[in-house]
Structures are given as C-alpha cells and as structure tokens.
A protein has these predicted regions:
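Glycine- and acidic
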Residues: 159-165, 184-189, 288-295, 326, ...
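C-terminal, non-catalytic extensions of nucleic-acid polymerases
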Residues: 594, 598, 602-832
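Active-site palm subdomain of RNA-directed nucleic acid polymerases
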Residues: 276, 537-565
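Catalytic palm subdomain of template-directed nucleic-acid polymerases
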Residues: 568-599
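Active-site-proximal helix-loop-helix substrate-binding element of RNase H-like nuclease domains
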Residues: 143-145, 152-156, 162-165, 169, ...
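Common nucleic-acid-contacting/processivity interface regions adjacent to the catalytic cores
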Residues: 283-404, 409-410, 479-539, 543, ...
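DnaQ-like (DEDDh/DEDDy) 3′-5′ exonuclease domain used for proofreading
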Residues: 1-186, 301-325, 332-373, 377-381, ...
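Proline-aspartate-enriched helix->loop->beta-strand connector
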Residues: 178-202
Length: 832
C-alpha cells in the first residue's frame, strides 16, 4: 500500500501534513512535539558526529522547544538535534523513507491570459483583467477552460484533447467559477511555464482585487491565505507545492544544452519539436483576443498542453519528487543542494543514532581554490584522444576519507601540488592520509561522508541493473498486451528516476560542501577536494607524457595538449605517423588508437593511481580514468574552447564523424540561431576540408545572411536593470540601451495597444542599425518582431550583424590555425 507525503509545512504550533495512504489523500493538522538532545554522562544510545554522548529531551510543542533553546543557549549550554521541525516530522513518520506514486499525485498544469493592450501585465499589481484560464490535472483527461467570449471545443485546432469550456459573462464570474473548480480539485502540485512568478501570483492578486481576499482561502487545503515571499514575487499556498516547469527545465534539462531563449515556444520546439500556436497574422495577442476569440482560447489551451507534454516526455516533475523523497524533504528543496543534502545526511545519521550539531558560525569568506585548467596548446592537432576521471569529487571524498569527523587538527607544512608531483618524501603519520593542501584526514575510522557516497554509488548501480532487466522484460511482452507493458514501463520509469535522482544528488554534493551556509562546511575539506583533484589529473598528465616520450624517443615533448578539471586531451598524431605512416583509412587508425588507449594507457594510469594511493597513504584507491573520445582532428583556441571531429565516444563507433563543440559561439545562447547553424557548418568544414573550402562557404553565407529577416539575425539577450538610473551611453549595456529605445518608440508612436513593452527579466533580441535612422541611435531591441511602424528594417546593419555574430567567432578559430577568412591576393595573382 502506497504511503508517502506530498507537502509538509508548519505554523507556530502545528505540522500541516498532506500525503497518501493507499489510494486515499490524507490532510492532517498535527500538534507536533519535537525531540532535542542534550549532553549526558549516563549510558545512551545516541552520540554526536564528534563523539559527544547525548540523550533525548522533549520540551513540548515547537514553540516550547524554541523557548527551551533560547533559555539554555544563553548560558552556553549546548543543545543538539535537528531544529528544522518539518524535516524531523517527516523523518519520524517515514524513518526508512518513502517513494511517491505518480499515479496518485495530482499535478495541475495551468496557464492564464491577461488583457495586454496597455502594456505588460505586472503580477504584483494585477491591474488588467484575466481573459482566459486553462487547467489540466494529471488525474483527469480533460482541459478545463474559462473565457469571456465564444469558443467551440468541437472545432478546436488543438488536437487529441477533451475540452470543457465555460463561457463567462465577465471576469468576476470567470474567477468565481475557476475558484470553485480549483477548490473542489485542489492539486498536490501546480506547474506551468513561469507559473511561479507570473500565472499564480497574478491569479492570487486578481482574485483578491475582484472577489475579495477571503476567497483566497479556498485555494488552500487548510483554508489559509497565500503567503507572499520576502521578494514580493511569489506566493506559497499551504498544502500545494509549486514546481515551475521553466525552473525545472533550467535545473534538470542540461542534456538539451544552452538555449537561445527560455520562452515556452523555443523550449517546446527543442523538447517536442512542437511550437506555440502562431498568431502572426494578428498584430498582437490583444488583437487576437478582439478579432478571433476561438483561436485565442486555442492559444491558451495549447500553452497548457505543451507543458503537460513536456512533462510526459522528460518526467522532470516525477524526477523532482523522487529526488526530494530520496532525502525525506519537501519537493521545493530539489532545486538546491544545501538543504537537500542537509536533510539527506540528517536521515542517514539518524538511522545510525548519530545526532546532528548546530553549525559553527563561519568567520571570513575567502575564495576556495578551484580545479586545474591547463593553458592548451592552441592550433590544429590530428588524432587526439581524451581520458576522463569517473566522478572525480565524490571519489576523492572516498579516497581521502574526507568527512567532518575525520579532519585532523594538524597540517603538514610544505605540501602543495608541485612538491607532490616531484614525489618528495613526506612522513605521513600513522592512520592518516595526506591531501594536496597538506591537510591530514584520519583513516582509523571510515568517515560518514565517504560511506554515504559509496552507498549511493552502490544503490545507483543496483537500480540501473533493475532498469536494464525491466527493459529486457519489456522486449519479451507482446505489443498487444497493453496492461502488462504499462506495468513494466511504469517500473522502468521508476528505476530511471531513482538512478537519475541519485546521480543528481551525488553531483551536487561538492556544491553543498563548498557553500558556507552548509551545516558541515569546512574550508579545509572543501579546498582539499579541489586541490587533490588538481594533483590527480596532473599525476595522469605526468605519467602519460613520460610513457609517450619514452615510446617515441623524444626528449621532453608535451603530448597532453589540454586539461580541464577531470579530463585531459592527448595528441597521438606523432604515434600514428610512426606506426601507420601510409594509412589513410580513418576506421583502422581509430581502432589502433582505441587499442593503445585500452591496452597501454588505461593500465598505465591504473598503476599510476595505485602508486599515488600509496604515496599519500590514502584510505583506498578510487581513481578510475577511462578513454572518452577519439577525434581525427581537434582545434583548440583557448581554455575550455575547442572543436573536435569525433569518430568514437566511450567505445561507440560513429558511422559518420560527430562535431563536438565546447566554448565556441555555436553553443552559446547569446548567438542567433541562424548563426549557430552557420558556425556549425563552418566548423565541420574546418575539421574535414581545407582553407579554400572554408573561404568559399563564408562568402556564400554572407550573401544569404543579407536576405534573412531581422528577427532571425538579431542577438538574443536577457534584459535586467532596465530602469536603473544611468546616463545614456555611460555604463549602460548596449542591449539595455536598445530596449529603452524600443519602449520609447512604442509610446512615442502610440503603439501600446498593439505591442507589449519590454520589462525587466524579459528575453529580447537586438540589432545594430546604420546611421542616420529614425531611432537616432545605432541599436534597437524588440521582444518578438521589429514593428513596421518604426521604419527601421531598411537600416539594419547586416554587415555588422554578420561580422559580430558569425565572422568574429569563426575568425578566432581560423587565427589559431593560421587560416584567413577570405582569399589573400599573392604576387602570382597580381601578375596573372
């Protein structure tokens, strides 16, 4: 029987609990009495992480606990235990954790439309009427929509949907009907696109203005009014969690890469290959509302549908829930690292009868030295192979037994990465290991942090095997057996979410440990991780260079052309030339390099890391370095900036080479999409053709570029500090200046009813203009389209746009390999 929580909050005296027992939703107000701990000389089952013997005490209610702590800490009497009483209550109720059943969780997707003929509708003011609302719950197959004009679901252009439309006389009746529906179907989770900072605060503020504040109580399972956050931008509705899908995408959608824009239209296209409903035949959304209400409502429904479909494909909401339940914490903590790790560690320690202490105040806030990034050997290199350390920071924690209770008080003087690389002899004390800062860690006991990381790794390995087994089972089930396939697919989804949750949790551990607000923050441990990481990667560099110099009988050649944190790039062109001087078959060369990597370099590195373990007296050897890519050609232009023509990646041989791009403008969200595409094509030419082919393509690209709409060639940017008082031209970012000019021209030409003005936080585009022009400046911005009424299209400086967005990044690469962007005239050309 499923038993799990969906929301746990508190008032001064009560815990407000929402969850499920079996198929039944449970809503409870609990008078909770927390447990604290105090030092004792008596025999006890409890101790702190640093060995203090403690025993339980229950002063009474949460308010009583607060008073008890204040009175006793004033006399320097130490009190232990978790003062986050929500976390303590969840742990009391679910000591062994719990798993969410997504078939029970009610997720409501929501989207609203607001009258926008007088500029952008500011949620905090909510001055303009709401003109449409659509909601779709995960436990109901119907889209419920409210509007003030005509709409026929039968002829809706939004396909594959069941729509129930409520036509209302006015906004008052619309909001009243919506509140009634919401009250009868209060969700566990509300989600939408930017719903946390727009849709929900606008709805709350508008209901208060139109229906009265008392109606807001109907939005909460506990009858509470929504609470505004400190910044005045978002509301908390007691009993319901808001998981804004835009924020989820930014947090969890890293596999989709950097985005030109985080507007729904772009992200839906990236994830689904689908877009918002196009209404470009109308001048604005306000015009669409006035002139085609049927399509206006379709537009509203479509937005809601897109977010729901993205969740169906990505499972980000399900993943956020799995991640939170992994730590026994509320869903909103899945967005961060400090809180979720604090709660996770608390639950692990609690199961071992280890009591947490209060964090000591942090004095000072000096910057932690980071990872090692080598200045690369710039230029073009043939036959490059990269090697990657597996999850470096978590494995360093395990290898050096780094944990709050294993940090030794002593530091060995004269220890740094350089001295360790020379293999100077250090007398490491017995039962200690030496980190690269000189900080010692005890090895006579297994640290809690390394234990936690190891358990997570083992758990993820088991879960991945379960997922693989379930996938194999699915292949054996007939496609006609829909019920059985559904059950197995549900298992696969569960296992995938579980293993991804563990991966995300592990990857966020160092982020928490290096944060001064983390309960277990200690700069000695945080810096020992990063600097020991520096030694680890440079240890590999040293060993690889020694091997290749001996093999190729070269003096002191640097074959490691680049290093970035946990990976290094080795140039093997000289080795290929020596062993296979006449070979032109790339597949054969690739197989040779793969053999060298797997049979020579990887075993060499394994031995090197075993030697390092003995040298620093590490708790255990956890460093594993494996071959990643084999590229026929690589061009480095600087740190973290390169392109590679990849033939094989982690053992997967590609049928045709794949382009890998890091740090180059083609993967930057600030580069226009059309230029990113042009840059990508050019990069492939650089890696596979010659200088003349690249020059011909650049010339052709410039000609085509000049025929594109301005909306395609303008720079995408996010705009902030729009209203910051700065003298024009002095310290004002160019895109902000462009946005101000756009707003000025909209007002100057009385176009407010047709075009929305740009607001702080908006994603915009801007372009250079030739002077003179009607705008009287050299740049103009716009949210979606450049208004024809501005009469500026004919002044767009296409040459400037082309040079800045396409040619300059390409020229940086060509300069690194001594190629020119256009053919250079020679004496032979001059004399014919």
């Amino acid at each position: 029987m499923a038993s799990f929580y969906t929301s746990v909050e508190r008032t001064a005296a009560d815990i407000l609990y929402v969850g499920y027992e079996g198929n039944r939703r449970v809503v409870e107000k609990v008078r909770f009495q927390p447990t604290l701990f105090i030092p004792t000389r008596n025999k006890s089952n409890y101790r702190t992480l640093d060995g203090v013997n403690v025993d339980t005490i229950q002063p009474g209610s949460m308010m009583d606990c607060r008073d008890f702590i204040r009175e006793n800490e004033a006399t320097n009497f130490r009190i232990y235990g978790n003062r986050d009483y929500i976390a303590q209550y969840i742990s009391d109720r679910f000591p062994d954790g719990c798993e969410p059943d997504m078939s029970l969780v009610n997720v409501m997707f929501i989207d609203i439309e607001v009258q926008s003929d007088q500029g952008f509708p500011e949620p905090s003011l909510a001055q303009q009427p709401i003109t449409a609302i659509t909601v779709k719950s995960s436990n109901d197959d119907t889209f419920y929509t409210w509007g003030i004009g005509g709409f026929s679901p039968e002829i809706s252009i939004v396909q594959d949907t069941r729509i129930e439309y409520k036509r209302c006389m006015d906004e008052h009746s619309l909001l009243k009907s919506f509140v009634s529906h919401y009250h009868n179907n209060i969700p566990d989770i509300v989600s939408g696109w930017n719903s946390e900072e727009f849709d929900m605060p606008y709805i709350v503020n508008r209901i208060a203005r139109v229906l009265g504040e008392d109606q807001l109580r109907k939005l909460s399972l506990f009858g509470h009014k929504p609470e505004l956050n400190k910044e005045g931008t978002m509301y908390k509705i007691t009993g319901t969690t808001q998981l804004d899908f835009m924020k989820l995408f930014k947090k969890l959608g890293y596999t989709y890469g950097n985005q030109e824009s985080y507007k729904l239209d772009n992200i839906a296209n990236v994830v689904l290959g689908e877009k918002k409903l196009d209404y470009s035949e109308y001048s604005s959304l306000a015009a669409l509302y006035r002139e085609n209400h049927q399509k206006f409502i379709d537009y509203n429904i479509r937005d809601t549908q897109l977010v729901e479909r993205m969740e169906e494909k990505t499972g980000f909401i399900a993943l956020a829930l799995t991640l939170a339940h992994k730590a026994n914490s509320n869903y909103i903590t899945s967005f961060g690292s400090v809180k979720i790790w604090d709660t996770y560690i608390y639950n692990v320690l609690r199961r071992r009868n280890i009591v947490i202490s209060q964090p000591d105040p942090v004095h000072g806030d000096r910057r932690i030295e980071g990872a090692y990034v080598k200045q690369p050997l710039t230029g073009m290199h043939d036959w490059v192979c990269s090697f990657d350390l597996n999850s470096l920071y978590p494995h360093l924690i395990m290898q050096y037994n780094m944990s709050p209770e294993t940090i030794a008080d002593s530091v060995m003087p004269g220890v740094d990465v350089e001295t360790l690389l020379t293999k100077n002899k250090f007398d490491v004390p017995k039962d200690h290991c030496l980190s690269s800062t000189g900080q010692l860690f005890r090895t006579d006991t297994h640290g809690i942090f390394p234990q936690i990381v190891e358990e997570l790794y083992n758990e993820r390995s088991v879960t991945k095997k379960k997922a693989l087994s379930a996938m194999q089972d699915l292949e054996k089930i007939s496609k006609d057996d829909i019920h059985q396939r559904f059950q197995v697919e549900k298992k696969i989804s569960l296992y995938n979410n579980q293993q991804m949750a563990v991966k995300i949790l592990m990857n966020s551990l160092y982020g928490a440990m290096s944060n001064k607000w983390f309960r277990y923050y200690d700069i000695r441990m945080a810096e020992a991780i990063t600097i020991s990481g520096q030694l680890t990667i440079r240890w590999a560099e040293q060993r690889i260079n020694k091997y290749l110099n001996e093999l190729l009988k070269t003096g002191n050649v640097d074959y490691v052309l680049a290093i970035d944190t946990d990976s290094l790039y080795v140039r093997l062109g000289d080795l290929v030339s020596k062993v296979m001087p006449d070979e032109t078959d790339q597949d054969k060369i690739c197989k040779f390099i793969d053999k060298v990597a797997s049979q020579k370099i990887e075993p060499l590195l394994a031995d090197a890391y075993e030697e390092l373990k003995e040298y620093v007296n590490a708790y255990e050897q956890k460093m594993v370095m494996a071959r990643e890519i084999i590229a026929s050609r690589v061009v480095f232009t600087g740190k973290k900036r390169y392109i590679a023509n990849v033939l094989n990646n982690e053992g997967v041989q590609y049928s045709s080479p794949k382009l890998k791009v890091t740090g180059i403008e083609s993967v930057r969200s600030s580069t226009p999409q059309v230029c990113r595409q042009l840059i990508e094509k050019t990069l492939k030419l650089i890696l596979n053709e010659d200088e003349f082919a690249v020059q011909a393509f650049i010339k052709q690209a410039r000609d085509k570029f000049k025929g594109l709409p301005v909306e395609d060639v303008a720079f995408p940017r996010g705009v902030n500090n729009l209203w910051k008082k700065q003298k024009e031209g002095i310290g004002v970012p160019i895109h902000v200046r462009a946005a101000r000019k756009y707003n000025h021209m909209v007002k100057e030409k009385n176009l407010n009813n047709k075009y929305e003005t740009i607001q702080n936080g908006d994603k915009i585009k801007f372009t250079y203009l030739k002077m003179p022009n009607p705008a009287k400046q050299n740049v103009i911005a716009f949210p979606i389209i450049l208004p024809n009424e501005f009469d500026l299209v004919r002044f767009v400086d296409y040459d400037m746009q082309f040079d800045k967005s396409y040619l300059e990044p390409i020229k940086n690469i060509l300069d690194a390999i001594d190629w020119n962007v256009e053919k250079q005239n020679t004496l032979e050309d001059f004399f014919g």
